[in-house]
């Protein structure tokens, strides 16, 4: 029943998104009584590009889901990625910043040409993990490193993301650059929030609230009524996995 309902919907939705994208692009290229600000134009052009990408993705027999991890140094993005993958596919290190360039992890069953051009220019790593056949995992540069180019690299990749996991930890869950990018992109893609290293969370934040409650309070003030917030212990799970007792359900 589900397949018979979803397939006609996808066939209808894809051309509708393509038409909407073309209409928006034509409107942007036309004349306007009042000139558009650079910020408004950039946002609308980004929306038109998103519509085009989504229309093309829905035309595929099996659309790919791009899951992007975003966060600062030392929050455990690479470790979390390994935990989500159910095996070691990303290199985690104590050297910081660990992630200097975007790394795209895709299943061996996916032909590289199916990847978005923005992803094809990143470092590509093939995996054979069950359950990742239609999922692309992207580990992005650390936002709060001294390399300002990291932000630009992330900005080039964000339009490709279907889901962004905003990863933080007890010490670092509301960094300025990450929060600004989140506010800019929140209307255009799905965000979920991860507080990693939760096993170390034993003290309140400077506001007197626990980190998860402090983050939820900030999200509520920005208009999020029911944000997805996950509290994880990725390293603990990876360690258990190494001895054969790990389960993603306990992540």
Where does each model-flagged region fall?
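Conserved nucleotide-binding/hydrolysis micro-motifs of P-loop NTPases
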Residues: 110-111, 142-144, 171-174, 198-201, ...
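Alpha-helical scaffold elements adjacent to nucleotide-binding pockets in ATP/GTP-utilizing enzyme cores
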Residues: 83, 153-156, 160, 177-184, ...
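Canonical P-loop GTPase G-domain recognition
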Residues: 199-251
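Phosphate-binding/switch loop-helix module in NTP-utilizing enzymes
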Residues: 125-149, 153-158
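Inter-motif core of Ras-like GTPase G domains
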Residues: 148-171, 181-190
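Short glycine-/polar-rich loops that comprise or flank the Walker A/P-loop
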Residues: 99-102, 133-134, 159-163, 187-191, ...
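Conserved G1/Walker A P-loop phosphate-binding module
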Residues: 2-138
């Amino acid at each position: 029943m589900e397949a018979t309902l979803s397939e006609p919907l996808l066939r209808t939705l894809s051309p509708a998104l393509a038409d909407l994208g073309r209409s928006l692009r034509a409107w942007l290229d036309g004349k306007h009584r009042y000139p558009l600000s650079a910020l408004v134009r950039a946002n609308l052009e980004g929306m038109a590009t998103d519509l085009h990408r989504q229309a093309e993705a829905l035309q595929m027999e099996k659309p790919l889901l791009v899951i992007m991890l975003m966060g600062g140094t030392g929050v455990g993005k690479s470790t979390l990625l390994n935990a989500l993958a159910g095996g070691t596919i990303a290199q985690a290190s104590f050297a910081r910043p660990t992630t200097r360039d975007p790394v795209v992890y895709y299943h061996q069953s996916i032909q590289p040409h199916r990847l978005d051009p923005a992803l094809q220019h990143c470092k590509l790593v093939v995996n054979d993990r069950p359950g990742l056949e239609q999922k692309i995992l992207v580990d992005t540069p650390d936002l709060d490193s001294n390399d300002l180019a990291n932000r630009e690299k992330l900005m080039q990749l964000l339009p490709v993301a279907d889901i962004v996991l905003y990863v933080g930890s007890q010490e670092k869950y509301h960094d300025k650059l990450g929060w600004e990018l989140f506010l800019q992109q929140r209307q255009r893609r799905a965000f979920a929030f991860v507080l990693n290293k939760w096993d170390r969370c034993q003290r309140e934040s400077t506001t007197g609230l626990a980190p998860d409650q402090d983050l939820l309070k900030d999200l509520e003030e920005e208009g999020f009524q029911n944000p997805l917030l996950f509290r994880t212990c990725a390293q603990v799970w990876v360690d258990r996995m190494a001895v054969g007792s790990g389960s993603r359900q306990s992540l």
